[in-house]
Each structure stands twice: as structure tokens, then as C-alpha cells.
UniProtKB/Swiss-Prot annotation:
Keyword tags: ATP synthesis, ATP-binding, Cell inner membrane, Cell membrane, CF(1), Hydrogen ion transport, Ion transport, Membrane, Nucleotide-binding, Translocase, Transport
InterPro entries recorded: ATP_synth_asu-like_sf, ATP_synth_asu_C, ATP_synth_asu_C_sf, ATP_synth_F1_a_nt-bd_dom, ATP_synth_F1_asu, ATPase_a/bsu_AS, ATPase_F1/V1/A1_a/bsu_N, ATPase_F1/V1/A1_a/bsu_N_sf
One MF annotation (Gene Ontology) recorded for this entry: proton-transporting ATP synthase activity, rotational mechanism
Assigned protein family: Belongs to the ATPase alpha/beta chains family.
Full protein name: ATP synthase subunit alpha
Amino acid sequence: MDIRAAEISAILKDQIKNFGQEAEVTEVGQVLSVGDGIARVYGLDNVQAGEMVEFENGTRGMALNLETDNVGIVIFGADREIKEGQTVKRTRSIVDTPVGKGLLGRVVDALGNPIDGKGPIVATERKRVDVKAPGIIPRKSVHEPMATGLKSIDALIPIGRGQRELIIGDRQTGKTAIALDTILNQKPLNVEGAPEGQKLYCVYVAIGQKRSTVAQFVKVLEEQGALEYSIVVAATASDPAPMQYIAPFTGCTMGEYFRDNGMHAVIIYDDLSKQAVAYRQMSLLLRRPPGREAYPGDVFYLHSRLLERAAKLNDDEGNGSLTALPVIETQANDVSAYIPTNVISITDGQIFLETDLFFQGIRPAVNVGLSVSRVGSSAQTKAMKKVAGKIKGELAQYREMAAFAQFGSDLDASTQRLLNRGSRLTELLKQPQFSPLKMEEQVVVIYAGVNGYLDPLPVAKVRAFEDGLLSLLRGKNVEILNAIRDSRDLSDDTAGKLKAVVEAYAKTFA
């Protein structure tokens, strides 16, 4: 075989010329100690607060405590594989998550990774999870209704797009049921081809719940056809505390994508008590000083910076909105505990759910007297304002009278009338789960209640009366419902027609 020296030297020269000196410089630190989901790391002198770091085995973590001689890192995953002396490298990126419409219909973990087995997520953008809330100038006052489909809420405690309304109550009082019904009620708005200004996308963040509970929730959404316009972010009870802490921020960032692009979204945090507990655990393990109930001093800021991101933006910013429905679980109806008082003071109103009402069969178990919406009737349609104004006053009087009526047996006629009306209105506000009503249907039902058409009926017949009236209006008299829906008002002409229909129906019903 003939070896040509010139040819070999030419090849060698070519190889040397194209030899890439690609040395990657990464800043690394060393694990000093690890345990309870917290790693102390020496080095990483230039790491940023909130920066994502990577351990040798690929597990991610987030730098939270920047001290003089070490960095406290919370670990997003199991800490079993991480050993003392291993290296940790910076990623130079603050914790972020994929955003966009590609997430709709998916179930993701607290870092935005899919956990539903439907393949990778199609997302073009990534956003930081912890960003500053919009200032005062880009905002606009809340004025559009965000219908939940529940009579007791839409009539008495109306929620507007861009509002923050707290759902608070003991365990097993139906807090998640209200959230679920609210998501299901958006189905008619999210039909194919509907204008973006009408649609309302839903983000549900499950924090510290059982996996079976989250799976059940997703199953209901799927069965009812609501998953296609929803995103579920799940940090279950078996996930480490840092995941439960970051999940609400991840969900909020996904919701903000819609808000900032002129669309509308609602986000449900279920529940923030568990996020506060996870944050307390992390803070204590990082040796931050404890405060009231052993929560850290900045637990108020934790929730306020999250909930301030829900906003209604003005026309220059695209008119989008993000509505927040945080859930808080109380212990034995104690709303004066630390976390409940904090969140009550941050939000624009609260829906109180009570165990006693729940067991009396009043479901949704809303205590109408203690619940408020600080946005109020500016978030209601004109039609609803006209009929719901009366019901508030009548129920307030009923509650006052009912307390006194327990003492005396001989009541005058007007008091008796008031008690009768109140008990029927209370019955009218009951509603089974998964059966949200459209705004126009709620208006006609409440109209019948406040105008005395239920007074002659026994309380047990109220539900049957309501169902019959609605099926009559959906069938023969659908033009009345359409008129209320299209004008969003109850004009004198429509009210006259409605009165005639209800009167005729009431006569036949007896």
C-alpha cells in the first residue's frame, strides 16, 4: 500500500484547522449537607435569588437563601440521590414555565411538565413564574360578570372578570364543588368559533391534594367536555413542599398569558392553606425566623404578590382579565386564624361556606349573611340587578326574624309572611352539583321567587316548580329567555310577558 506523506500532512492540517476549542464554563458549587428537601451548597457565589440549579443526577432545585458562606437550595424532587460533596451547577435562568394555548386540555406538574401521558406540550413561549403584578395605570375597574352558574352566588355575591373572590370554609363543605361548577358553567362561552372576548379559559391549581381527588376532578372535566378549555396544575400531597409552594405561581403565569393577550381566564387555587404550610416547612428548614403560628414573616407577601396578579387590564393593554378564586380551609369555622385573615384582607370579597348549612341540606352551603363581594352589582347584568336587589333585603330580614321567631309562637301576619317567603327563597337558592344555570334562567327563577309566586306552595314543591317553569320557558316561551340573554336586561315588555307566563304556570301547577 502506497502511503503519501503529503496527503497525510494535508489531512492532519485540515483536522487541526477545524478543531473546535469548545470549552463550556459553568459555575459549580459543592453540596455541604442535604436533608428534608433542602440542600446547603458551598460556592455558587454569583447565583441569583430564585435561580434554578441542577444537581449531578439531573434533579432541579431553586436557590432561596443566599448567605455569606453558603446557599440554601430547595429541591424540586427526591433528595435521596443527592449526596454530600456532589457538584451543583447554575442554569443561569430563573424558574420558568411553558405558557400558551398548547397547555389547554393538559395536566401538568408544578414546573409545567406534562403528567397526563399525552405526550410533550406544544408551547412556543416560556415565562418566569414569579413576576411583578400589573401597576395601577394598566388596570381598569371590574365591570363584566364572571358567571358561576350558581344562583346563590350570581344573584347575591356577584363575581366580575378580574376580581379576586375567596372561597372559605371547613373541610367537606363544598368549596371544590363551587370551583368545579364554575369551570363547567363556562362551557357555552368556549364553544368553537366564539369570539375571544367572550371566552373564559380556566386554570385549576391543586395544591397538596390526594392524587385520587385530582384524578376524579380531571375525569369530571373530561366527561363534561370542559377539559378542552382548562389547564390543571397538580402538586399533590406526595410531591415535595417546594413543588406545592411553586405550583400556584406556575398556574398564575399560565393564566397571565391569556390576560396579557387580550383574553380572559379564571384561576382557582385549591387551596392556599396548604401552600402556606409548604412554605412554612421550607422556611423553618432554611432556618428563617418563625412568626405567628410558626409561619414566616413574609407569608402575607407570599399570598398578596400571588393574588395581586389577578387583574382587569384597560383598553390600551388589550382589555384582558384574570379572575382569581383562592380557596382557604378553616379549622372549626375559625376565620380569625392567621392565614384566613390574611387572605380575606387581600381579596375583594369572600364566599363563606358552613358545615351546619351543608348538613341541613342547603347546598351550595353559602352563608349569605357573612359572604360579600366588594365589587358588587357593577359585575352584574341589568336583568340580574333588577331581580336580585329585592332578594338580598328579603333574606336579610328573614335571617333576623327567624332568630326571634324561635322564642315566640304567636307571630303577626306580616312576620309570618316574611318567614314563609324567606324559607322559600332559601329553598330556591339550593342547587344540585353539575347543573349550572344560565344567567337568563336564573333571572326568571328569582323573578318568580321575589314576586311571591312561590309563597302559596309547600317548601318541598319549590324545586319541582322551578324545574317545570324552566322547561316551559326553554320549550314554548324560549323568546323570553332569548330576549333577556341578548339585551342582558329585563325590559318592561319582557317582564310583562314573563309575568303572564309565570302566573299561568302557577295556576296550573297548584
